[in-house]
């Protein structure tokens, strides 16, 4: 174990030298603003500190980006993660969550100025729910309860007004792109709340699942692509339409990884993202999946293959990117996703009972290898060929 830690530390020191090669500065030849963007003002929120506890892999990717890209991308993620916290607040009935989610969407659009108090009320209700549940069991309240709130989520809700103010400090073009993205994401989250208000049920078919993954993640690939084409000189030699398609498929693939990894907990929460027509063809229902029946394995494996195809699109997308720093930040989630799929395949249907997660030591190794070894487009091509 000690040797593993030393090895990771050595890799990370080399990774830091790579980052210093492409420091954030107005004179950087790799990434410069273009178009009509004005210079961004200092943000009213420390986006990296808020990102770290709520998304390990995204935090690592964002750190690699130059400021001109990091600020709109990080703020978009923080807003999406905040809306996700609202949608997942089990301390409130679905109707109330939908109402609050709609208000938050209006606040992002600049049409609700009093969202802060509502979110603080939500925070109090979640804390009260956790404490009440713990008292009834005679146990202490841990830091992270499925029926309560994590410290990272608490920080997001407490900082929501600052995040919204920071959005207004972005350039008009960045504000437009972030708001368009969040309008799509919150629509998908709203549909989620409406769809499963009546208990455990499955999505109707594969198209409905693909539509859902576009609403909550495929649109992020489109957002990333548009921002990079607008802000990064010599971003890629490929056509924007090609990159938009690859980016969309990449985002969908990442969301499918999340769905596959979290399938067990989603089922226990009353949500089944696997198509009902595929389950029916295997003589299964959504409720049957709680017992991890062997007949479900071919369906599960099919969607692992679909997720892998999306990650392959992500690798093709990253290979096409010219600036090394942006390329590395783009490919890291794909590398973590590929490893997650391998672990899911190894676990089989046991993954429905025990959540699979890539160990932190492996993630550190991926950061090092991706930063040092896979910054080269030719090496990325070889890595893609081995998938």
Question: Regions from the language model: what does each represent?
Answer:
Residues 2-7, 11-254, 260-387:
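Catalytic cores of Mg2+-dependent Asp-rich isoprenoid enzymes
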């Amino acid at each position: 174990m000690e040797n593993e830690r030393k090895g990771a530390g050595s890799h990370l020191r080399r990774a830091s030298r790579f980052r210093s090669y492409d420091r954030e500065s107005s004179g950087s030849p790799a990434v410069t603003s273009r178009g009509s963007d004005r210079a961004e003002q200092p943000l009213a929120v420390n986006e990296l500190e808020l990102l770290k506890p709520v998304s390990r892999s995204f935090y690592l990717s964002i750190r690699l980006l130059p400021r001109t890209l990091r600020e709109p991308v990080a703020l978009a993620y923080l807003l999406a993660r905040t809306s996700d916290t609202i949608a997942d607040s089990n301390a409130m009935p679905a109707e109330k969550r939908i109402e609050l989610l709609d208000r938050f969407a209006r606040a992002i659009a600049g049409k609700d100025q009093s969202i802060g108090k509502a979110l603080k009320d939500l925070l109090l209700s979640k804390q009260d729910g956790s404490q009440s549940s713990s008292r009834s069991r005679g146990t202490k309240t841990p830091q992270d309860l499925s029926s309560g709130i994590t410290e990272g989520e608490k920080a997001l809700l407490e900082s929501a007004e600052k995040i919204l103010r920071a959005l207004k400090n972005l350039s008009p073009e960045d504000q437009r792109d972030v708001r368009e993205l969040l309008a799509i994401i919150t629509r998908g989250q709203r549909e989620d709340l409406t769809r499963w208000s009546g208990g455990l049920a499955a999505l109707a078919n594969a198209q409905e699942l693909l539509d859902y993954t576009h609403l909550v993640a495929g649109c992020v690939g489109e957002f990333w692509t548009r921002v990079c084409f607008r802000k990064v000189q010599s971003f890629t030699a490929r056509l924007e339409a090609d990159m938009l398609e690859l980016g969309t498929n990449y985002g969908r693939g990442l969301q499918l990884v999340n769905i596959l990894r979290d399938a067990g907990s989603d089922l226990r929460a009353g949500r089944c993202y696997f198509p009902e027509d595929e389950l029916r063809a295997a003589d299964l229902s959504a409720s049957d999946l709680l017992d991890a029946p062997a007949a479900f394995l071919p369906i599960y494996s099919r969607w692992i293959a679909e997720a892998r195809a999306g990650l392959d699109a992500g690798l093709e997308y990253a290979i096409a990117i010219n600036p090394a720093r942006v390329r590395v930040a783009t490919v890291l989630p794909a590398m973590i996703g590929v490893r997650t799929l391998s672990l899911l395949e190894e676990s089989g249907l046991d993954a429905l009972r025990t959540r699979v997660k890539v160990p932190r030591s492996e993630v550190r190794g991926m950061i090092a290898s991706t930063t040092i070894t896979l910054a080269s487009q030719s090496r990325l091509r070889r890595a893609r060929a081995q998938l």
